[in-house]
Design a protein with these regions (language model features):
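Bacterial N-terminal signal peptides that target proteins for export
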Residues: 1-10
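The canonical Cys-X-X-Cys-His
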Residues: 64-74, 163
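Sequence/structural segment immediately N-terminal to covalent heme-attachment motifs in c-type
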Residues: 53-68
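Short, well-ordered beta-strand segments enriched in hydrophobic/aromatic residues
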Residues: 112-119, 237-243
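Bacterial N-terminal signal peptides
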Residues: 9-18
Length: 299
């Protein structure tokens, strides 16, 4: 009996070890980095983007070209930063740092999708930019929006489909109106899945958000985000999201699988700013063993 008990004990240990291996921490050293750039967009809304008199790129978009297909070159983004910083497009004043790089890496296994962002956060937002007014006053926030294929043009326009001229902090807009997707609905899968890490203040009070954007942005209700973790070393932030592949539209959680290409965008708030006073990426795609600007590696 003693031998059997020992055998079962060893067998149980082996089972536990196997389970640990199945959910082992991702090995990021084996994952290629894709550098993208995030920039301060000012009051540039989706309506502005689609107006030919203000944005000549509208023609390319109507023909099926993506924003990044036009604006990204070998040297980075080709955009008119002086125009974005001018009073017409940033009436409260632009940050000193208009653009900065973010490295993106991604892994997936049989259960989870992992996305890691690495960046150095500037702390030079305009003096009149809106900032956190309650403790903890989060010094940095990093968010990812994952687009549903049911959102028309999500692969082309990225998160700009949620940014409209009538949302809060836009000139003359309703101060209570949040980001939204036109004709958005959870049941039909017409929404953006939204996850965010918030740093807290002075190393305390970090938290995470698992929400979505339909007829408005909702910062709760999601169940797919396992955890969002962040650390800062020598001024460089590393933020890692662990999210289940499985989701449920009722919770605002999209479902992902190998062979899928996912539209996504990145937004970084620095210097305790809120609302539109952030740096955002163009729309990119994440490929899970599929074509994409960023390749998610299977581990």
């Amino acid at each position: 009996m003693k031998i059997k008990a020992t055998s079962f004990s060893v067998f149980g240990v082996l089972l536990g070890f196997g389970a640990q291996l199945a959910h082992a921490a991702p090995d990021w050293s084996q994952v290629p980095k894709r550098d993208i750039q995030v920039f301060h967009p000012g009051v540039v809304s989706h309506e502005w983007v689609m107006q030919k008199s203000s944005h000549s790129g509208r023609t390319g978009l109507t023909k099926g070209e993506s924003c990044v297909g036009c604006h990204e070159g070998k040297a980075g983004l080709d955009i008119d930063l002086k125009k974005l910083a001018a009073k017409e497009l940033e009436p409260v004043g632009a940050p000193k740092t208009m653009i900065f790089p973010v490295s993106v890496q991604s892994i997936f296994d049989d259960t989870n999708l992992y996305i890691r962002l690495t960046f150095k956060a500037p702390a030079d937002a305009a003096a009149d930019a809106s900032r956190e007014d309650a403790s903890p006053k989060h010094e940095v926030k990093a968010a990812i929006m994952l687009g549903s294929p049911q959102v028309e043009h999500s692969a082309q326009h990225g998160c700009w489909l949620t940014c409209h001229k009538d949302v809060r902090s836009m000139p003359g807009a309703d101060p209570k109106k949040k980001k939204y997707v036109e004709h958005g609905e959870l049941a039909g899968g017409v929404y953006y899945d939204y996850i965010q890490w918030k740093s807290g203040e002075a190393g305390k009070g970090a938290t995470q958000v698992d929400g979505h954007v339909t007829t408005e942005r909702v910062n709760k209700g999601g169940k797919a985000l396992v955890k969002a973790e962040g650390e800062v070393k020598d001024g460089v932030y590393t933020v890692t999201f662990t999210r289940k592949l499985a989701g449920n539209n009722a919770d605002g959680d999209l479902t992902f699988a190998a062979g899928q290409t996912i539209p996504f965008g990145v937004a970084i708030h620095t210097d305790k700013t809120v609302w539109r006073y952030h740096h955002v990426s163009m729309g990119y795609t994440l490929g899970l063993r599929a074509p994409g600007d960023v390749k998610a590696i299977k581990q």
